[in-house]
Swiss-Prot record:
Protein name: Photosystem I iron-sulfur center
Subunit architecture: The eukaryotic PSI reaction center is composed of at least 11 subunits.
HAMAP family xref list: PSI_PsaC (MF_01303)
Catalytic activity, as annotated: reduced [plastocyanin] + hnu + oxidized [2Fe-2S]-[ferredoxin] = oxidized [plastocyanin] + reduced [2Fe-2S]-[ferredoxin]
Primary site of residence: plastid
Positions in coiled-coil regions: none
Keywords: 4Fe-4S, Chloroplast, Electron transport, Iron, Iron-sulfur, Membrane, Metal-binding, Oxidoreductase, Photosynthesis, Photosystem I, Plastid, Repeat, Thylakoid, Transport
GO cellular component terms attached to this protein's record: chloroplast thylakoid membrane; photosystem I
Range of residues in the leader sequence: none
Binding-site residues, [4Fe-4S] cluster 2: 21, 48, 51, 54
Organism (species): Staurastrum punctulatum
InterPro entries in the record: 4Fe4S_Fe-S-bd, 4Fe4S_Fe_S_CS, PSI_iron-sulfur_center, PSI_PsaC
Amino acid sequence: MAHSVKIYDTCIGCTQCVRACPTDVLEMIPWDGCKASQIASAPRTEDCVGCKRCESACPTDFLSVRVYLGSETTRSMGLAY
């Protein structure tokens, strides 16, 4: 099972998700599309354990973790977006 962390353009650059991640999957990168000029990125998705702590920490509720089951259909991990 692979996890893919999706960061949408409503990220406010607060870094709470980065600090909440127990496996250090997330990092902040420069991004002109938000107020803080930085956005969360997930370059190490293979290390994601799907705990969703990043989602819980996100004050804007626009961070989502989705589970991809190989060639099967994508299923949401209880997210609303």
